[in-house]
Swiss-Prot record:
SUPFAM superfamilies: Trypsin-like serine proteases
Keywords assigned: Digestion, Disulfide bond, Hydrolase, Protease, Secreted, Serine protease, Signal, Zymogen
Lineage top rank: taxon: Eukaryota
Signal peptide: 1-17
Gene from which the chain derives: CHYM2
Official protein name in the record: Chymotrypsin-2
Length: 258
């Protein structure tokens, strides 16, 4: 699967798909995500694609309601609202869905790079989205997701470190780790703090460039936002912003900018 930010040994690399190189769609890889499978149409109606006009897919995100998208801060830094659009209502980057304009970008005031602490942000849509069978919001979990829980990761991330972007949305079940286990397995404990939740399955499975900002879901509720990892699917944990840790920031930020 995809991911935009990846830690290589102890160094975090931010791979901004739009700013570095254009992501090339490749139907040959449509069934070859890193350990995942093609998501059934409509199975993740909250999933959106953050698009850069003229480039295409750059990051993932989640619809929280008809005006707000939750994503990673590093997907927003350096952009103006007019630089980004949000694709909703489709599992395909080539057809279907609707592109929506954005009128506000907000990210956590204590977002830290290169550790990627507080790597969480919000996008406000210019106009309310119309919900349908393929476009739905997702609730977020206000309590911590359990350790050793099976959670679902979706995204249009690369199928391998240097692979192309799959045309269709990919889905992968992964398992949550304790932060202590995550720090030990990551080999860089400074990158993991209370605001993170980590997942791991095995080598050959995980997030990759382009998944950043996308959703991690547990029992139908949003628990994580893709932040960082070791590219790609190499048997190291992936790190996510822990939504329960930031739920008050999310709530107040939306309320203060409604």
């Amino acid at each position: 699967m995809l991911r935009k930010v990846f830690a290589v040994v102890s160094v975090l690399l931010v791979v901004s798909a739009a700013k570095v190189t254009k992501l090339v769609l490749d139907d040959h890889y449509v069934n070859r995500v890193v350990g995942g499978e093609v998501a059934k149409n409509g199975s993740a109606p909250y999933q959106v694609s953050l698009q850069v006009p003229g480039w295409g897919h750059n990051c993932g995100g989640s619809l929280l309601n008809n005006r707000w998208v939750l994503t990673a801060a590093h997907c927003l830094v350096g952009y103006e609202p007019s630089d980004l659009m949000v694709l909703v209502g489709t599992n395909s980057l080539k057809e279907g869905g609707e592109l929506l304009k954005v009128d506000k970008l907000l990210y956590h005031s204590r977002y830290n790079r290169p550790q990627f602490h507080n790597d969480i942000g919000l996008m406000r849509l210019e106009q309310p989205v119309q919900f349908s069978e393929l476009v739905q919001s997702v609730e977020y979990l206000e309590k911590a997701v359990p350790v050793n829980a099976t959670v679902r990761l979706t995204g249009w991330g690369r199928t391998s470190t240097n692979g192309n972007v799959p045309t269709l949305l990919q889905s992968l079940n992964v398992v949550t780790l304790s932060n202590e286990d995550c720090k030990a397995k990551m080999g860089n404990p400074k990158n993991v703090d209370l605001g993170h939740v980590c997942t791991l399955t095995k080598a050959g499975e995980g997030a990759c460039n382009g998944d950043s900002g996308g959703p991690l879901v547990y029992e139908g509720k949003l628990v994580g936002v893709v932040n960082f990892g070791v590219p790609c699917g190499r048997g190291f944990p992936d790190g996510f912003a822990r939504v329960s840790y930031y739920h008050e920031w999310v709530r107040t930020t939306m309320a203060n900018n409604s």
